[in-house]
From Swiss-Prot:
Protein source organism: Trichodesmium erythraeum (strain IMS101)
UniProt-recorded name of the protein: Undecaprenyl-diphosphatase
GO terms (BP aspect): cell wall organization; peptidoglycan biosynthetic process; regulation of cell shape; response to antibiotic
One MF annotation (Gene Ontology) recorded for this entry: undecaprenyl-diphosphatase activity
Alphabetical keyword list: Antibiotic resistance, Cell inner membrane, Cell membrane, Cell shape, Cell wall biogenesis/degradation, Hydrolase, Membrane, Peptidoglycan synthesis, Transmembrane, Transmembrane helix
Cell location: Cell inner membrane
Length: 312
């Protein structure tokens, strides 16, 4: 029954988006004049909300513009507006970040290498290495990865479904007894390895890391909290690399004003999404995201089979 409701809800979203897109902005994104402020605000909202909950921002930023009839805004724009989410993560977790940073610095000065703050900083650092390493491998050995089959619509749908099933298993077998203070360096490495899965569009960075956290017995809110902290270096690096690309090559089919608008929109909606998720996971499970991911993936596959959605 829950899956049926999620399926119907997702279908209604797709239908509504298509109608809104056709009525408000009928032209696809093909040149610098056609990515309007309205479109940038919507795409920033999509980025902000879906980056911070375990449903994959990359998938939604590819699928939703297509459903709206706008076309794919491109990988560079998608990565750059993620910087808006970074601002919100820093804003929301400012106390955690300052405590960890200054605590780690004090520990190094006093040679207290068993300090929880130093261990947390090392955990985040070591946990970031896997996704950077594999990301560089992809850049070297699959230079056209952004246009590969792994970024196709059908691949995104399948990844969404598979990740939902992994989250089901994590919910079933995870003990959920360990809080934030019980995190150690090994946890950072394990969750960092789980984060590598996010290189596959449709998996979701927060989805893979929260799932990894649940597998090793973390509380849901603890898994989400560490997921956001761990994501800061990786998302920032990806956003800055693509920002440099846009600055070097020009903003082309996006435009500077639209990009800045998208970033600002992402800041606002990311903060709202983070605040909601952290409160939600204090008392609730992740089944709402499981049902949504299943419905999202299946609906995309149905759309492809029926010809409503193009497998690009």
């Amino acid at each position: 029954m829950k899956f049926f409701c999620a399926f119907i809800f997702t279908a209604l979203i797709f239908i509504s988006l298509e109608k809104i897109g056709q009525s408000c902005c009928p032209n696809p994104i093909v040149d610098s004049e056609q990515l309007t402020i309205f479109q940038a605000v919507i795409l920033g909202m999509v980025q902000g909300v879906t980056e911070c909950i375990p449903v994959s921002s990359t998938a939604h930023l590819k699928i939703i513009p297509v459903a709206l009839g706008w076309g794919d805004p491109g990988v560079a724009f998608t990565a750059v507006i993620q910087l808006g989410s970074i601002v919100s993560i820093v804003w929301y977790f400012w106390n955690d970040l300052t405590k960890i940073t200054f605590g780690a610095y004090k520990s190094i000065i006093t040679s207290d290498y068993q300090s929880p703050d130093l261990k947390m900083l090392v955990s985040i650092g070591l946990g970031t290495i896997p996704i950077v390493f594999f990301g560089l491998l992809i850049k070297v050995f699959i230079p056209d990865f952004d246009n590969s089959r792994l970024r196709s619509t059908v691949a995104i749908a399948i990844a969404s479904i598979i990740m939902a099933l992994l989250l089901v298993i994590a919910e079933r077998i995870g003990s959920r007894k360990r809080n934030f203070e019980k995190l150690d360096i090994r946890d950072g490495i394990v969750i960092g390895l789980a984060q590598v899965l996010a290189l596959i569009p449709g998996v979701s960075r927060s989805g893979s890391t929260i799932t990894g956290g649940l597998f090793i017995g973390l509380e849901r809110s603890t898994a989400a909290r560490f997921s956001f902290l761990l994501g800061l270096p990786a998302i920032t690096l990806a956003g800055l690399v693509e920002l440099k690309t846009l600055l070097d090559e020009g903003f082309g089919s996006v435009g500077l004003v639209a990009t800045l608008t998208g970033v600002f929109s992402a800041i606002i909606f990311s903060y709202i999404a983070i605040s909601w998720l952290m409160r939600y996971l204090q008392t609730q499970d992740t089944w709402i995201f499981i049902w949504y991911r299943l419905a999202f993936g299946i609906l995309i596959l149905i759309g492809i089979i029926s010809g409503v959605i193009e497998n690009t």
